[in-house]
Design a protein with these regions (language model features):
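Short loop/turn motifs that initiate or flank beta-strands
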Residues: 6-9, 13-195
Length: 195
């Protein structure tokens, strides 16, 4: 015999709590199942709330390593009710180079941590990292020559990853031809390439 349940709402206020039957009701079903032959009163009623799986996205600038730190958390895809979580630990990305959606070759010690929500209500399903281009700084000097050109040979690049080097060529521009200190502009005229 089979009975139908009328679709009425039960409320669960927290995890590991007794579930109140509330307005849940039985209805006649198939194979001779009559609701009048059964009652919910006095029975045992249990509902398991499973952890919700989350996919995490980390994001940082290129640093020449495959380290993926929980502190680089950018977003989760399925948090509920406006909750927030954080991440701890670190894993290993499959590549050190600039790209989006790089998978982990190892999750290492990456773990969810409480925010406004409880980490115990969620499980970490997958983690990817977006690695963005590293921002370089430039500086230099030249002798007065009555023009605003800043040739690549007069410009030094900084904020490179330790041990890495680049070639650069082309011409940028400064704000004035006169002696003084100026912001380098028109950096699109400078190109960089591997040594």
């Amino acid at each position: 015999h089979r009975l139908n349940r009328r679709q009425r709402q039960m409320c669960i206020r927290d995890s590991n709590k007794t579930v109140s039957v509330g307005t849940l009701a039985l209805a006649d079903g198939s194979n001779g199942g009559l609701a009048a032959n059964y009652t919910l009163s006095g029975g045992t009623h249990q509902l398991t709330v499973n952890q919700r799986p989350l996919n995490a996205t980390l994001a940082r600038q290129y640093d020449g390593t495959t380290t993926a730190a929980g502190s680089d958390l950018s977003s989760f895809d399925a948090l509920q009710g406006g909750e927030t979580l954080t991440m701890t630990g670190s894993g290993t990305a499959a590549s050190a180079n600039v790209a989006n959606g790089i998978a982990m070759s190892s999750n290492g010690t990456l773990a969810l941590a409480d925010g406004t929500g409880l980490a115990s209500n969620y499980s970490l399903n997958s983690t990817v990292i977006n690695i963005a281009q590293r921002v370089l700084n430039s500086s230099g000097s030249k002798t007065y020559d009555a023009n605003t050109d800043a040739l690549a040979g007069a410009i030094t690049l900084s904020n490179l990853v330790s041990g890495e080097a680049l070639n650069h060529s082309g011409t940028a521009t400064i704000g004035s031809a006169n002696a003084g200190s100026y912001t380098i502009t028109n950096l699109s005229g400078i190109s960089i390439a591997c040594l």
